Regions:
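Extracytoplasmic cell-surface/polysaccharide-interacting catalytic and binding patches
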Residues: 65
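Short, small-residue-biased leader/transition segments that mark boundaries at the very start
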Residues: 1-6
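Ser/Thr/Pro/Gly-biased, low-complexity, turn-/loop-rich segments
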Residues: 7-15, 34-39, 154, 170
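Short, glycine-/polar-rich solvent-exposed loops and beta-turns at beta-strand/coil boundaries
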Residues: 68-74
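Glycine-rich loop/hinge motif
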Residues: 31-62, 71, 139-145
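Bacterial extracytoplasmic/cell-wall-associated proteins, especially those involved in peptidoglycan
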Residues: 57, 61-62, 76-290
Length: 290
């Protein structure tokens, strides 16, 4: 596998403490009686729609996640957005876990108490279309990719690497796509299983799914998380040196580190894997992951 990085960036840093247990002082706008009208909600890059839903319930903006998840699954209520319409018209759309996966932008939002699931979703898609600007669309077109394909690539980059390596991982993926190689990205397996395992088994790799990049050639069926603007940018502008030098492989290093090891040849890659694989197996074992 190309490896997976266990991100160590502390959420606290990213969220400025918005995820802390709710108190009226946590940046809420209140009425005269001290009750909040608006709540600040932080949704983290790399989270899935299910994690977004969980957070919205935890923050007391939604009473439960069922309606939110069902709207995100079908996406049909949001076809007025050009980006969503394109997905709804795409092949195998019925097999996407959530049509809107990757289309709800991670950010900190002011959300009215009493906002409906549908209103919240609209706000998040609007932000995605703002982040994926006309310049992004032009660049994607120049590269021969659709917005959906770039969001898919960006979502994989988001899950595979820390920000420092985004453009390098992007270069490896672009090089593999160009060479007609399978992407073989572990994070696409994690999306199917819901388990972040460092050392994948043969049965993991054989999972029958259009998201499984060990099985499908090219990109997975759709995005696997909500990518940050940085990951989108990396998908559009891969590291030029790594593209030119045709890097085709990367793997995780020590499980405690976000550092990746990049290789040009399979031989170099296999040498790196031989060094680090025992550490990954140990890491999974200590966490009771089979």
């Amino acid at each position: 596998g190309l490896g997976d990085v266990y991100k160590r960036q502390s959420l606290e840093k990213y969220t400025n403490g918005f995820l802390n247990s709710y108190t009226p002082s946590s940046g809420d706008v209140t009425r005269g009686d001290g009750n909040p009208i608006v709540r600040n909600i932080t949704l983290i890059p790399g989270w899935t729609i299910e994690q977004f839903a969980e957070q919205l319930v935890k923050d007391g903006v939604l009473t439960d996640s069922a309606e939110f998840l069902s709207l995100c699954k079908s996406g049909t209520s949001f076809s007025e957005f050009y980006s969503v319409q394109d997905v709804l018209n795409s092949r195998n759309v019925s097999q996407r876990r959530y049509v809107l996966e990757g289309y709800l932008a991670p950010d900190t939002y002011e959300i009215y108490i009493g906002a409906t699931a549908s209103e919240i979703i609209r706000k998040l898609i609007t932000q995605t279309e703002r982040v994926f600007s006309v310049a992004c669309e032009d660049r994607a077109e120049e590269m021969g990719y659709t917005m959906d394909e770039i969001l898919t690539l960006a979502s994989m980059i988001e899950k595979e690497a820390s920000k420092a390596d985004f453009t390098k991982v992007s270069a490896v993926f672009h090089n593999r796509l160009k060479a007609g190689m399978k992407l073989q990205s572990d994070v696409t397996i994690h999306y199917i299983t819901g388990v972040r395992k460092m050392s994948l088994t043969g049965s993991d790799l054989a999972l029958d799914s259009l998201y499984n990049t060990y099985q499908v050639t090219g990109l997975p069926l759709g995005p696997i998380c909500a990518p940050s603007a940085d990951a989108i940018n990396a998908a559009l502008y891969p590291d030029e040196t790594f593209v030119a030098e045709n890097y085709l492989y990367f793997c995780a290093t020590s499980p405690e580190s976000t550092e990746l090891h990049f290789s040009r040849t399979l031989q170099e890659h296999e040498q790196a894997v031989a060094i680090y694989a025992p550490l990954w197996q140990q890491y999974d074992k200590e966490r009771g992951i089979e």
